[in-house]
Amino acid sequence: MLTRNPKTKSSLQILQDSVKWHHMAHKVNSLLDAYSGLLSNESMILAVNSSFVDPLLQFESQLKIIESSFGMLVVMPSLDKVKEMGSSYEYIEDMENLYHNILNIYENILTSLVSKDLYKLQILKEMLVWMSKDSSYLQERIMVIINKVLRFTVTKVRKYISVDAPCLGLLAAELSLLCSHEDPSIVKQASLGMCHLLYIARCQNDIGTNKPTNGKSHSLQFPSSDVEFLPKEFQQDESKIAQRVGQTLLPPLLTDFVQSLLMKLSSPDDKIASDAASILIFTLEFHAEKVTMVSKIVDAIYRQLCDNNCMKDVMLQVITLLTCTSPKKVIFQLMDYPVPADDTLIQMWKAACSQASVAPHVLKTILLILKGKPGEMEDTVTEGKRFSLDITNLMPLAACQALCTFLPLGSYRKAVAQYFPQLLTTLMFQVFYNSELKPILKDRALYAQDALRVLLNCSGLQQVDITLMKENFWDQLSEDLCYYHGVCFIAKTLSEYNFPQFPETLSYLYKLSVEGPRRSEDTVIVLIFLTEVSFVDCEQLCSHFLFLPKFKSKFQFLVSLPLNVGSYQDLRS
């Protein structure tokens, strides 16, 4: 009986060994190809770096070469697999050296670019973006290279007399998201990179304020080694990240940081979107006052909500936080959209007016917008200013519609009482303006009237509105009733009910009559209203502020205006 020699390999084993050898040979060839490719790319990048070409074209061409090199790097086998290739110690050592040389070439390319121009730190941001788009690209060895380049930059900026690194905010946003990654090795490298970045930003700040830039002058001490310095405050702690980033970055860079995170809310990766939301909200809670370009951010949120509202609550919370620190900018932007407002815009209005602390500022901004006249051209507005970027000014219409949302809120009760005279008078102006433009505005002409009714009802004057409704006043006002008769009727009805806001309203009307409104029709409305309410017993209401000689002269001016309003007795009849 024949026996098989144990040393004899079967055909299957021979085939397996052959496949393994070819596979290893393929890996070796891939390393050699990466090595030769990176050497070639390095020479091209350095040649472009030394040429006198347009900086933007130079950067774009270099970025394409960097991306090509990046592609070679990420498909390389891991170091452990490289070690498996060798059959002897010398061969393994050669493969390891080749592996490390490839990484060193890529690192040298980046450091040579950054050493000449800190603007090219933007390349690191692009690398992080590439990794965020494909999880297979997110490798510890790439993060180590990024950290080494940032560490090299730290040593350079300590000797600079000026630091211009405009991409720090965008780079910080990408790194901050990786500080909450599931892989501890990625978290370690990202948090370390964040410390390097913030050190660069602190140097930039200190140079700008003529402070010394040695390591002792910063709370973020320059690390002595990667092993010793583990900034645990950044690891899985989004609140700390937001605090330190907000404290360190200059306003323009912090704005870039916020805008970048805002864009991440639309990421198809739920983890990225969730982490971005947390860091974004923390940042605005701590440092919203440093954010610039608020109008642009509000507009970006509106467009994102229109396209995709998966993170709607977070975006609306951003509106709320920005309104707390920049109410005027937020409200002006929210009023500069088509009228009538869509559901998305109304939700943003509600978010903007959710805090009682900013209610007075919101109403003051709306009153400022309501100084404009719908359809008024640029050259007809006082001092040549406009309230809208459009050919015509329709922001007052949006403001009237917004008041219908703001005024009934309980958080606005105190502010509405404070600004009742201004709101009442301004809305009467707007009702008149809209009645003039009714053929053009159509249904939109009723927003001012609706806002006026809401103001009456939320100011304890429901009976006034009921009386006006019984008299069919609102319907007539929107049809063919002479508006000056309407002003007289509103004033008379308010006077009959002895509305509690009478002293403040009379004082404000008198102030307007003395100072003179911007338009002649405003003057007519003010004086008709003022004359009507002045028939109330002023002594009983302690309206000692009514200086009759001046008022008489204003009333004479009213009679002389050629506005076809008839005699005042006709108006009162």
Curated annotation (Swiss-Prot):
SUPFAM superfamilies: ARM repeat (SSF48371). HEAT repeats lie at residues 118-155, 252-289, 292-328, 357-394, 418-458. It comes from the Eukaryota. InterPro entries: ARM-type_fold, Maestro-like_HEAT, Maestro_heat-like_prot. Keywords: Repeat. Pfam families: HEAT_Maestro (PF21047). This is Maestro heat-like repeat-containing protein family member 9.
